[in-house]
Amino acid sequence: MSKGILGKKVGMTQVFAENGDVIPVTVIEAAPNVVLQKKTVDSDGYEAVQLGFDDQKQNNANKPEKGHAAKAETAPKRFIKEIRGVNLDEFEVGQEIKVDAFAEGDIVDVTGTSKGKGFAGAIKRHNQARGPMSHGSRYHRRPGSMGPVDPNRVFKGKALPGRMGGEQVTVQNLEIIKVDAERNLLLVKGNVPGAKKSYVTVRSAIKSK
């Protein structure tokens, strides 16, 4: 069955394997999550468990958020996500989920919000090739052709300049190098999306071999 936990990206560092290899890792702080709700086929049409992470000030939460958290006897949460594909019998509302749910060697998918880059051109945003920079060329870093004359419009999806980043990104099949239960830390091999202190979701990999 699938497993999942919510956390906050701390940053990157490196650890040494037993054979001396250097492994780049991302540190994810995953303080105990609280099960806020169990969704069933009868009531919601699908099965999932709703987790909450990072307490929110009571003054910043509205009345529905406070009432939803009160059912689990906890404080309102800043970050709430659902994890599907789990065995609902293993969860109870108000239960805490800790990092020891995962083990070293587990393969996971990590979802986060990519760093915002602001308004970017087609070369940076879509890896488009630039034009010649000399020999009389007047086409350097522009978007290029908008398409043929006949449709008399620009097709959806045309690679054009625009706001880059700030999107949901999932990096798949990352290995958990270490689980630090005392400090509520997960060390994941490689990089994960987002800036430092941004929220991430760690789930069991769906395409792992």
From Swiss-Prot:
GO terms for biological process: translation. One of its GO terms (molecular function) is rRNA binding. Keywords: Ribonucleoprotein, Ribosomal protein, RNA-binding, rRNA-binding. Residues 128-152 are annotated as: Disordered. Pfam families: Ribosomal_L3. GO terms for cellular component: cytosolic large ribosomal subunit. Transmembrane segments: none annotated. One of the primary rRNA binding proteins, it binds directly near the 3'-end of the 23S rRNA, where it nucleates assembly of the 50S subunit. Belongs to the universal ribosomal protein uL3 family. Part of the 50S ribosomal subunit. Forms a cluster with proteins L14 and L19. This is Large ribosomal subunit protein uL3. The gene is rplC.
